[in-house]
Structures are given as C-alpha cells and as structure tokens.
Amino acid sequence: MIGMGIETSCDETSIGIIRDGKELLSLGIFSQIDLHKPYGGIVPEIASRAHLEKINLLLEETMEEAKIRFEDLSYVAVTSSPGLTGSLMVGAQMARCINMVYETPILPVCHLQSHFAVLHLEGVPTEFPVLGLLLSGGNSAVYILQEFGRMELVGDTMDDALGEAFDKVAGLLDLPYPGGPHIEAKANEYIPTPDEKPILPLLLRNLPQGEVSFSFSGLKTAVMVLLEKQKEVSKEQICWNFQNSAFDLVERNLKRAVAKTGIRKVFAAGGVLANTTLQKRLEVWAGKNSVELFTPKKKIYCTDNGAMVASLGYHLFRKGYKKGVDFTVNPSRQEIFS
C-alpha cells in the first residue's frame, strides 16, 4: 500500500510518500526559515504564499523520486488541523485536486497526532497505551496515546510553548531565528562550576500535586529582567541556565505523568526534540526512573514533514477512515477524528 502525506500547517512545505506505513520512498521539505528570519518569527501571509509557490514543484520531485504514478496511491493524507488557516488551505487544496482527478481517498489528519506516527517510520514498537510528549514551536503537552489517531490530553502549556520560548529568548539575546539551535550552541560553550547556583527560577515550583502543566512565559521574563540588572552575565551562561530550567520542568512533568497514569513507555516528538541536550537528559531521566523512552533518531523527523502525515494516514486508512472533498481545515486543535 502506497500513501502520500501533505504537510503545510506552518512554515514547512513537505510531501512524503511511503509504502505500508513505514518504508520511505521519498520525502521533500521546503523550509521557510530564511523567509521569516528578518521578522524574528512566522508571518502567516508569507507562509501561505510560500506554500503556494513551492508545493507543485515539490509534488513533482517527490513523485519522480518515488518512481510512482498517481494511480499507484492508495490514499492521500493531509494535515487539516491545527495550524495557520491560509497554510492549511494550500495543502488541503492539493489533496482535493488529486482526489478529483484520480479519485484517491482523502484523509484529513491532526498535525499533533502525526508527530507521534513518525516513530513508526523508525521501527519503534507500537504497543499501546503509551505517553506522548510533544514539544514544538506551538505545542508543549503530554498525552495518553490509545492508538494512532486517538489520544487523551494529560497536561498542556498554560502560555508559551517551549519552542516559542526558545525563539523569544534568542531574540532578547540578539541570536538568529530560529532560536533553538543557537541557544543550544551557546549553552554548550558554558561549563558551570560544581557549586554554581541557578540564575533563573525553578518553573511552576508550587504546582499542585499530581497536576501536569507547562509554562515558559515566566522564563522569558526572567531572562529579560536578568539582562536589565546584570549586564556582565554572558550569553553562554544565560543559555545554559535557560535550557536547564526549561528541561527540568519537562522532566518533572514526565515524572508526574508516569505517576498519574501508571504508563512507563514514552514517545517524545516535535521540533524541540532536535535539541541533543534535551534528548540526552531525557535518556538519563528514563534510565533512572525505569521508563522506556523513544525519540526520533533522524533530526529531519523532529520537524514538520509529510512522511509522518502519510504514516498516520496509513493507520487511519486501514480502519476505514476517509473524507470527501468538502472537508474543512481548522486552525484550532482537534485531538480525535471520528
């Protein structure tokens, strides 16, 4: 069974083609980082226009690389929520066109759920239920994954997502956009002394027992105040402390989620998982707490991509899920498609 996945929810235009849910035949990604860099963040109008300009060429390239015809496709999965409305509409229209010409079944899928499906592409055992940790530019949450395409929220962010916090703090430090790689690089240059005290606060220290919640806006404010009061603090020290404080909250929330649900298997996904320091910390944490942890081995799978959309589509298609061309896109989060 050959399937296509179309991803245009935010600032990556991507099309992936896979066989039987996990064999990658081709994957094309156009990143818009350079387009948004001058603005220090994503501009929705620029994003949707770039998708429109690139998607046809990307389709041709991925089809040619996969060496298939449109008639070979069993389904076309497309991200329909959540995301930027204009961007989502570009991918949706491409899926509709393929359906109208070749009668290929359409599967609108949830972007959040597809991030976890990428682990199936890497051969991760998929025995459910498992905990899903999603850390990206727009999401910081923990879920119970009942199966591919069905999940329950355990804990969410109360304000900024972790990826967003990286970008905002990078802006305060005059580091390039996107902030994640540059903050990690600066942090790696700093070596704290054994008795050194943190210069940034412990996040959500008074969170009620058993509650799983993220909050990163206060960390950005703390960095701003620190820069105003202590000019002599280096960027490297701030970046190291920023990561240390943020990742500490991630670990504490995972520990709470495991205790709350009794589930000791964790799938971690999303763009922030490209951070090597975070991956290593989570691996150490999992080992100490007897938790099975799985993260994407390829950094390209941490970012938004069409392969993960196609993989989720495979599982949903086998269950008989599909929609007509009149499906709608939704910028808000939809956890379950029925």
Swiss-Prot record:
Query: InterPro entries this protein is in?
Result: ATPase_NBD, Gcp-like_dom, KAE1/TsaD, TsaD
Q: Write out the transmembrane intervals.
A: none
Instruction: Tell me where it mainly resides.
Output: cytoplasm
Q: Which GO terms describe its molecular function?
A: iron ion binding; N(6)-L-threonylcarbamoyladenine synthase activity
- Reactions it catalyzes: L-threonylcarbamoyladenylate + adenosine(37) in tRNA = N(6)-L-threonylcarbamoyladenosine(37) in tRNA + AMP + H(+)
Q: Which GO terms describe its biological process?
A: tRNA threonylcarbamoyladenosine modification
User: Can you list the GO cellular component terms from the UniProt entry?
Assistant: cytoplasm
Q: Tell me, what's a Pfam family for it?
A: TsaD
Q: What is its EC number?
A: 2.3.1.234
Sites where the protein binds Fe cation: H111, H115, D304
Where in or outside the cell it occurs: the entry states: Cytoplasm
Q: Which residues form a coiled coil?
A: none
Q: Which residues bind substrate?
A: L134, L135, S136, G137, G138, D167, G180, N275
Needed co-factor(s): Fe(2+)
**What does the note accompanying the cofactor annotation read?**
Binds 1 Fe(2+) ion per subunit.
Give UniProt keywords alphabetically. Answer: Acyltransferase, Cytoplasm, Iron, Metal-binding, Transferase, tRNA processing
Q: What class of enzyme is it?
A: transferase
Q: Which family does it belong to?
A: Belongs to the KAE1 / TsaD family.
NCBIfam families from the entry?
Answer: gcp_kae1, T6A_TsaD_YgjD
Q: Which HAMAP family match?
A: TsaD
Q: What is this protein called?
A: tRNA N6-adenosine threonylcarbamoyltransferase
The species is Leptospira borgpetersenii serovar Hardjo-bovis (strain JB197)
Biological classification of the source = Bacteria, Pseudomonadati, Spirochaetota, Spirochaetia, Leptospirales
